[in-house]
Amino acid sequence: MAFPAPAFSLANLLNGSYGVDTPEDVERLRSEQREEAAAACRNYRPLSAVDVSESVTEDAHSLQTPDGAPAEAVSDEFVTYGAEDYLEKSDDELLVAFETMVKPMRIGQLWCPAFNKCSFISSIAMARALLLAPRTSHRTMKCFEDLVAAIYTKSDFYYSEECEADDVQMDISSRDVPGYSFEPWSRTSGFEPPPICEACDMIMYQCPCFDFNALKKSCAERTFADDYVIEGLDGVVDNATLLSNLGPFLVPVKCQYEKCPTPPIAIPPNLNRATDRVDINLVQSICDSTLPTHSNYDDSFHQVFVESADYSIDLDHVRLRQSDLIAKIPDSGHMIPVLNTGSGHKRVGTTKEVLTAIKKRNADVPELGDSVNLSRLSKAVAERFFISYINGNSLASSNFVNVVSNFHDYMEKWKSSGLSYDDLPDLHAENLQFYDHMIKSDVKPVVSDTLNIDRPIPATITYHKKSITSQFSPLFTALFERFQRCLRERIILPVGKISSLEMAGFDVKNKYCLEIDLSKFDKSQGEFHLLIQEHILNGLGCPAPITKWWCDFHRFSYIRDRRAGVGMPISFQRRTGDAFTYFGNTIVTMAEFAWCYDTDQFEKLLFSGDDSLGFSLLPPVGDSSKFTTLYNMEAKVMEPSVPYICSKFLLSDEFGNTFSVPDPLREVQRLGTKKIPYSDNDEFLFAHFMSFVDRLKFLDRMSQSCIDQLSIFFELKYKKSGEEAALMLGAFKKYTANFQSYKELYYSDRHQCELINSFCSTEFRVERVNSNKQRKKYGIERRCDDKRRTPTGSYGGGEEAETKVSQTKSTGTRSQKSQRESAFESQTVPLPTVLSSGWSGTDRVVPPCERGGVTRA
């Protein structure tokens, strides 16, 4: 009696009515199969012997297998497993099956996709039903395991056309082994679709006309020859003998073919490595190619243009006082750089320059945030701050330390500036709402190619006097040290004695980076940021009266620039030069970051002022728009993001340790600075040299792997050639070697003028007598036998004046006899010459004495 096949539906699929055997049927079939297999083993008779001299034909299809084979146990693999069998399995067995079929991506302790027992078993049942359903598409359906994975991940059930084309075009003849021929083998799914009876359209396990003996025979006859087609093996008796004799040789050979990826071509190492053989022209060419708009930049008269041109500005509540301006203090001049890297001259704090800086740095506060409940939301942000960053046990067990010691250290530091204990004022008698204002005379180097269209505007400093700052700074310094001790291990603030950018055991490679660039950070802070700081300071243990007092005179303040005669009121925004500037900016950045991103997804988090950097194994997930809508900040997520913070790149060496490298582009620009004062003994130049050496102390750790990392990060950040960064390292290596090499980068007009007028060395002896005519600035070279005399005059008694220059041969190394002579050797000064051969030009290497002739001074 034929029963109608149940209709396909998800309900029939899950309850076992369609395509799934009931547990009773499965158990009954398994017991019958075991009994039949045991009977076959008892009735087995070995085959008759075959003549050894017979050779095996080369036709693969003519190979015959024995009718039966002894078996100690019969495998149950050909029995179909249904969804009910997986329901009876343990969780560990299901995890193994899930990892085998779905093949999830393992990321740490997480699986992607995640394991879900119900979804996995439903996917198995659905895959089995789809394989049994009639085919309606010409495309090739995936095998059982891949189909389960496709259903679980909600992807395509069919193989793509590219995969099918690859399977068709796969050529295996080139991989044949002499004497053997292999056939392509595809991975088995582990699922055997049950046979369907053509008469009753039922599964043959449940059909009366099912021939189990034929099924048993087909399974028992499967031998080694069914998987490996053997050709040309003479003298082989049968497959059993072949397996016993050649089995150890053939078993390791897997007849499995896959499309091999194209092997990567090994690129030979570049032999043109950066070395210390660098000259000044090479460094200038690097600047010209990397910074095309900086090479011809000269702002010598830019401020003159600003002061002399018409000026218009729009500011609210500004006060100008032009009656008692302080004139510029003249200095003794500055060293002139040989390199032209786009560095500007020092800015003078005139009225127009200060107004321009205030317009950009302090006025025109952006209003990008939405309306919120400040008190409630500020408390929530502070709570999130402590949950994300602070170790509560460490905070509870730590105390303030070294407050008085920090106070004495501050007084000793500024003792040379005239600060003493007698000058400390009574803070209750001072109006702390008044701040002094000034502009930074040194403009920050510009790395963008905009110097041809945009003039950099100097930054501003809003500060209290040292007598006031000295009483707040020790408290906030001790509080910041306590804050650092209570941070979680993955949080790093690279400042102070207990933290830096050197991270042992942490590798920045193969990590996702998140860098947030916050523009207009100081003036964008409002009352919401001040309330957040107040809650965080109270939570860190700062005395509540001091916190309240500090926040009160930051709500409304008045800044004044005495030199420029400019003053204006400000409110809430960050004071860039008080005792709480760095600490306050850091906790504001950390609080904003914790509210916009889940900090648990990061392995390392670095914060310093308004700079932030995070490292994670997965792409960071968060809402960066809250920086603007909630915190009133102009935020930009740097793409592509590289390990870069505080103008430094983070690199990892071969041992997995991370160290910091200053930005080569900014260091090259500093080599052309115009702010080094002139001194006779080069003390200021030597101080800059020592600072340059301290910043580049990483050069000894730069292996080829680190140089390659730096080149890649440099290209990603600036979209410029990474080879230029390697050449910059070669220049740094040369100019950090000794002070004499570093002195090649600067010269002074004063030295040059003195050298042209007069000089003294062992090769030349210059005798001067008074003359009524002006001294000539350039020497005229003529032949030794020229007897012409200089013009006579009545200067100084009317005596004739003749300058005699005698020439001596140079023997050995010349000794330096004066400071002017040493300056002549370190500075290259062009000397116009007229040689005896008639050639005229500028000679920088060989002195005139070695050319021959007489020099007249």
Swiss-Prot record:
It comes from the Viruses. One of its GO terms (biological process) is positive stranded viral RNA replication. The keyword Nucleotidyltransferase applies. InterPro entries: Bromoviridae_RdRp (IPR047309), DNA/RNA_pol_sf (IPR043502), RNA-dep_RNA_pol_alsuvir (IPR001788), RNA-dir_pol_PSvirus (IPR007094). Residues 780-857 are annotated as: Disordered. Residues 511-624 form the RdRp catalytic domain. GO terms for molecular function: nucleotide binding; RNA binding; RNA-directed RNA polymerase activity. It is an enzyme of class 2 (transferase). Its EC number is 2.7.7.48. Keywords: Nucleotide-binding, Nucleotidyltransferase, RNA-directed RNA polymerase, Transferase, Viral RNA replication. It catalyses: RNA(n) + a ribonucleoside 5'-triphosphate = RNA(n+1) + diphosphate. Residues 804-816, 824-840 have a biased composition (Polar residues). Residues 780-789 have a biased composition (Basic and acidic residues). Pfam families: RdRP_2. RNA-dependent RNA polymerase which replicates the viral genome composed of 3 RNA segments, RNA1, RNA2 and RNA3. Belongs to the ssRNA positive-strand viruses RNA-directed RNA polymerase family. Interacts with replication protein 1a. This is RNA-directed RNA polymerase 2a. The lineage of its organism: Viruses, Riboviria, Orthornavirae, Kitrinoviricota, Alsuviricetes.
